[in-house]
């Protein structure tokens, strides 16, 4: 395909137009009085959201240069969302401010690479200041306040705080759609995985369709179990011990399954057979996790063990096991605490060394099952559109709360950025590097100004006022009052704040050092009658 090339100012201004088109749509959502954006869907109901990354993903521009500019800013929002789970709109606003201020300096003839170094050094100094001023999240109320701000709903914040209190920092909190109105929290103590009983005949409670085993032995097998003769020696030992048996294997089939079902129906022996979760290497790893949690051993040819020779000492134990048709929950496994802690440390190390987002996600799930628990927040709403929007807000708020616990919190409302400006006062930079640092200085006020603008206040006057207030004090845009923001519960996780700044600065530096843009030449479309007008809005100065 033929290419079109733009150089110098034309290239940069084309990218800026794309950035402004996207940023102007996203930034109206910032702050407690921000608006929503409606996203059309080709099928089904439209989505109403105030989530920056969701809006950014939907924007596709026609002009090739503008499209590239918008795509670069999408990366800012996406990366911030991936790292911190929130702050996508703030990152977009910062990127727009950095690029706008930077291009003014480009027009004045500043050296691009010098500016870039200045921006990087300034961001490093501001990040250090943010981390230094962060306060640890110590109370349930602080978690509730932080999550509540992210979700725009105090009740959601309180529910997330309760969930984190129950399952711990490493615990899994999932959000599901509910058919009932309102919010519900379900807690699972122990390990749960998404595999249920192989046969419905194993159910001990026909009404609830679940099998409950009290104080069972747990047999873990790394292969298929098909013949009775392999299983019989071990079964006899378990029957003599007078305990029920949970079998977790790659599969249980044929006469082995038939024998277990018949014994259950006759009432001579209570057991449940379940397929092991996952597949391939992940199945082996999860079986090993269950073995450590329950104090058992995976019976596998790889470790020289077979069912025929296995003794009862190789079986795991738990206080209770509940199995439904879809999932298995092991409560209070009998594994050694030190062995479990060692396994947790091993998984954490694997997470840190993993380059794959998918692998990290699966490792995080394994870590949570061993180290914490599982909390399920069920969200309901009056309409499908409202339900989707609410579920998304809760998911963002959960990640926001975890980020707060991880690195601490700083004053929200854009105040932390503005009050970090003094970190640049002691800089000994000259020339274009000093210009780059000044670009960051100017841009740091942009989030607060946008929050003020969305709240119907005068941005410039407010920014000047807040910059002279004591650290941590600023405008609460919800109440229009000046107060100690941390004490008032207006806080942002420092992980979200620093990630937004770092990612915005990274893309801005690329914008400002661009000298040419190569894009696909638009194909000529066949003439069609006009159906309306298109309006465009550029960057807004304060």
UniProtKB/Swiss-Prot annotation:
Main location: cytoplasm
Cellular localisation: Cytoplasm
GO cellular component: cytoplasm
GO BP annotations, alphabetical order: protein refolding
Reactions accelerated catalytically: ATP + H2O + a folded polypeptide = ADP + phosphate + an unfolded polypeptide
GO MF entries: ATP binding; ATP-dependent protein folding chaperone; isomerase activity; unfolded protein binding
Positions bound to ATP: 29-32, 86-90, 413, 492
Gene3D superfamilies membership: GroEL, GroEL-like equatorial domain, TCP-1-like chaperonin intermediate domain
Assigned EC number: 5.6.1.7
InterPro entries the record matches: Chaperonin_Cpn60_CS (IPR018370), Cpn60/GroEL (IPR001844), Cpn60/GroEL/TCP-1 (IPR002423), GroEL-like_apical_dom_sf (IPR027409), GROEL-like_equatorial_sf (IPR027413), TCP-1-like_intermed_sf (IPR027410)
Keyword annotations from UniProtKB, A to Z: ATP-binding, Chaperone, Cytoplasm, Isomerase, Nucleotide-binding
Superkingdom in the source lineage: Bacteria
Described function: Together with its co-chaperonin GroES, plays an essential role in assisting protein folding. The GroEL-GroES system forms a nano-cage that allows encapsulation of the non-native substrate proteins and provides a physical environment optimized to promote and accelerate protein folding.
Complexes and interactors: Forms a cylinder of 14 subunits composed of two heptameric rings stacked back-to-back. Interacts with the co-chaperonin GroES.
Family named by the database record: Belongs to the chaperonin (HSP60) family.
NCBIfam families referenced in this protein's UniProt entry, alphabetically: GroEL, PRK00013.1, PRK12849.1, PRK12850.1, PRK12851.1
Protein name: Chaperonin GroEL
Lineage, uppermost ranks: Bacteria, Bacillati, Actinomycetota, Actinomycetes, Mycobacteriales
Gene, per the UniProt record: groEL
């Amino acid at each position: 395909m033929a290419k079109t090339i733009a150089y110098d100012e034309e290239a940069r201004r084309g990218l800026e137009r794309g950035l402004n088109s996207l940023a102007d749509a996203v930034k109206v959502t910032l702050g407690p009085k921000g608006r929503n954006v409606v996203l059309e869907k080709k099928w089904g109901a439209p989505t109403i959201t105030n989530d920056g990354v969701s809006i950014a993903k939907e924007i596709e521009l026609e002009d090739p240069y503008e499209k590239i500019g918008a795509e670069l800013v999408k990366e800012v929002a996406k990366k911030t969302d991936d790292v911190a789970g929130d702050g996508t709109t703030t990152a977009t606003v910062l990127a727009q401010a950095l690029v706008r201020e930077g291009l003014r300096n480009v027009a004045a003839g500043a050296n691009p690479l010098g500016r870039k170094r200045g921006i990087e050094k300034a961001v490093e100094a501001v990040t250090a200041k943010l981390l230094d001023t962060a306060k640890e999240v110590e109370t349930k109320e602080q978690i509730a306040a932080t999550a509540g701000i992210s979700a725009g709903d105090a009740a959601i914040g309180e529910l997330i705080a309760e969930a984190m209190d129950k399952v711990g920092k490493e615990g899994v909190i999932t959000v599901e759609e509910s058919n009932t109105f309102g919010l519900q929290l379900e807690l699972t103590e122990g390990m749960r995985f998404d595999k249920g009983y192989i046969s419905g005949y194993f159910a001990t409670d026909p009404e609830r369709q679940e099998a409950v085993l009290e104080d069972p032995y747990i047999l873990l097998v790394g292969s298929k179990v098909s013949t009775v003769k392999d299983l019989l020696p071990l079964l006899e030992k378990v029957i003599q011990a007078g305990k029920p048996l949970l079998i977790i294997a790659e599969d249980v089939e044929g006469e082995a399954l038939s024998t277990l079902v018949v014994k259950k129906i006759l009432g001579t022996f209570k057991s449940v057979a379940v397929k092991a979760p996952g597949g391939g290497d992940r199945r082996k790893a999860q079986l090993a996790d269950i073995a450590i949690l329950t104090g058992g051993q995976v019976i596998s040819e790889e470790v020289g063990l077979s069912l025929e020779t296995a003794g009862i000492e190789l079986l795991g134990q738990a206080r209770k096991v509940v199995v439904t048709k879809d999932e298995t929950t092991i409560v209070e496994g009998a594994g050694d605490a030190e062995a479990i802690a060692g396994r947790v440390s091993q998984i954490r190390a694997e997470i840190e060394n993993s380059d794959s987002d998918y692998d990290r996600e699966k490792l995080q799930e394994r870590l949570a099952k061993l180290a914490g628990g599982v909390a399920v927040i069920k969200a309901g709403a009056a309409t499908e559109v409202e339900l989707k929007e609410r579920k998304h807000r809760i998911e963002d708020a959960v990640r926001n709360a975890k980020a707060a616990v991880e690195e601490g919190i700083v004053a929200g409302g854009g105040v932390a950025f503005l009050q970090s400006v003094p970190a640049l006062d002691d800089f000994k930079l000259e020339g274009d590097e000093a210009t780059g640092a000044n670009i960051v200085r100017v841009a740091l006020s942009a989030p607060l100004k946008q929050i003020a603008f969305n709240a119907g206040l005068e941005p410039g006057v407010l920014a000047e006022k807040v910059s002279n207030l004591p650290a941590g004090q600023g405008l609460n845009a919800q109440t229009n009052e000046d107060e100690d923001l941390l004490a008032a519960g207006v806080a942002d996780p420092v992980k979200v704040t620093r990630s937004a700044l770092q990612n915005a600065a990274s893309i801005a530096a690329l914008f400002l050092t661009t000298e040419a843009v190569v894009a696909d030449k638009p194909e000529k479309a066949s003439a069609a009658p006009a159906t309306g007008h298109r309006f465009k809005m550029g960057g807004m100065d304060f």
